[in-house]
Amino acid sequence: MDSSLHQYLVNGGMDHFLADHFASILSRDPLILTEADTRNLNSSETNLFETLYGYVWNHVRFKPPTSDKGPGWRVEFRPMEIQLTDFNNAAFAIFSFLLARAIICFHLNFYIPIDLVNESGASCQKRDAVLQERFWFRRRDWSSNSDFINQKMSRPLQSKCQQHGDGEIYGLMTADEIINGEGTTGGFPGLLFIVHCYLDYMKAPEKERDTIEPYLSLIRDRASGISPTPASWMRSFVLKHEDYRKDSYVNEKVCYDMMRAIVYLFLLSNAVFFAVAMISYCYFPFQVHHIVHACTLKVDKDV
């Protein structure tokens, strides 16, 4: 990173963390740059910046305003893979949004060193990582002790979030512990607990919370292993299919039946489409064990 560029951004009013981010990007040479891009430069145009910034796609990506009339600063959350149903996609989108609002509202700090992020990134690529692997997470000093945070956080969260005097700031935790909490005195209460406290603080109407709860329940069940990941579900489907010969070759029949099961699973995941799915059953035939397999929530742990 160009330290002079970092200092220039700080002198312009940018905070150190954001200056680190942009200086590390702008210090690199662009992949493509034409002579026209360098002509008639002025502070009101963002074309050159977009050229430099457009080739960097981090997991969490800042999107600065493109003009005074367009949308303001935006943040893209990019690491999530596509889910099998709209309901599952909506669940992760809702959870990410509510957690982001809670972090901002309560001034929470979940920063961890980038080398630990990379180590966790390697762990999460392993098979059945949700249940079998552990990931680095900030276990201590993540909750502010300021009067501001004490006023905004509900009493249950304050009692659970007492700062530890001993122990490492960062620790290895399972996905279940990160999402649902460690379940021990003084342990991390879980990101879902923080989201619920945010909803309490915002005095979310009961009707809205009833609408949100099924989505948050999916996040809880996915982290605990009650609900399988799409990868686990697909592996289980293939292994149990009568045409799979345990030879690592997935033939067209297995793929076709899986896609039909996914469509049926999508229909069953939404109550609005449930009646349509039943009516269409005679035109969309499944073998019974495929339907049961598509709807089951449990898979073999060794898959």
Which residue stretches match the model-derived regions?
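C-terminal accessory/tail domains of diverse enzymes
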Residues: M1-D302
